[in-house]
Amino acid sequence: MATAGASSFEDEIMESDIELEGEAVEPDNDPPQKMGDPSVEVSDEKRDQAQLCKNKGVDAFSEGKLDEAIEHLTEAIVLNPTSAIAYATRAVIFVKSKKPNAAIRDADAALKINPDSAKGYKSRGMAKAMLGKWEEAAQDLRMAAKLDYDEEIGAELKKVEPNVLKIEEHRKKYERLRKERDIKKAEMEKQRKHAEEVSAASAALKDGDVIAIHSSSELDTKLKAASSLSRLVVLYFTAAWCGPCRFIGPVCKSLAEKHRNVVFLKVDIDELNSVAYRWNVSSVPSFFFVRNGKEIDKVVGADKNGLERKVAQHGSS
């Protein structure tokens, strides 16, 4: 049995082999066979001599004398390097000699001269099958069958095509596994980034405390962090000269300690009057309830009971 290695994927997708039919041969690494010079003008006399040499080669081949047949065909090719049939015939003999690389070189030469050479496609397909290049072999053999079908081509296709089918199924399987792996990796990366964002957001917030805000950008950062954690924000506007604010301040601290999932942010309107203007603060203390960056409720004045009720209501939702 011959095997073909599958693509290797990272993680859980491991290398796998396909069990294929047929025996591959070791590639022949002999020096390239003698080829003719296609630029040479061939006389009628040389064509006739080449034909005689080709006939001798075919006779020797029919008698099983492969080396002698190759010698005669080589002589024919040198005499008439424009003969596609001479190259294709020598390619067939190289296939029988189990020299697939030499056969492929001759088949290529034959097909360059005559792109419709059935024997060229046939010998190249058989040679590629010997090397385990099943898909390329099938392509050449199918073309040979289309041009001039014979039983040998049909028999070779019956050996090659099941392997091609196995390779295609194997490729589809591992393409599916690769896609599943990529989806899994993307999801893991998404989760990792989310975890980093949550960690960074959590670090930016102080659970159980009222956070004093000293700049507009700091407020935006805290609001964004709270949104990424889907947490309620109580935005508390105060002022140093405000008596009711001094009364409600300890209440805010107590609520922050009690509702640790709620983010309490404190803004002094004199320090950050642009922020107060942006939020349309008309009096202090004022409390804006914010979720995902949007105001959902509001308490104006030092209404302890109202504030506690609103925090409990929105903080638990």
UniProtKB/Swiss-Prot annotation:
Keywords: Disulfide bond, Electron transport, Redox-active center, Repeat, TPR repeat, Transport. Residues 1-48 are annotated as: Disordered. Residues 9-29 have a biased composition (Acidic residues). The record marks G243, P244 as: Contributes to redox potential value. Disulfide bonds join C242-C245. Residues 189-316 form the Thioredoxin domain. GO terms for molecular function: Hsp70 protein binding. TPR repeats lie at residues 50-83, 85-117, 119-151. InterPro entries: Thioredoxin-like_sf, Thioredoxin_domain, TPR-like_helical_dom_sf, TPR_rpt. One of its GO terms (cellular component) is histone deacetylase complex. One of its GO terms (biological process) is response to stress. The active site is at C242 (nucleophile), C245 (nucleophile). CDD domains: TRX_family (cd02947). Probable thiol-disulfide oxidoreductase that may participate in various redox reactions and act as chaperone under heat shock. May interact with HSP70 proteins through the TPR repeats. Belongs to the thioredoxin family. This is TPR repeat-containing thioredoxin TDX.
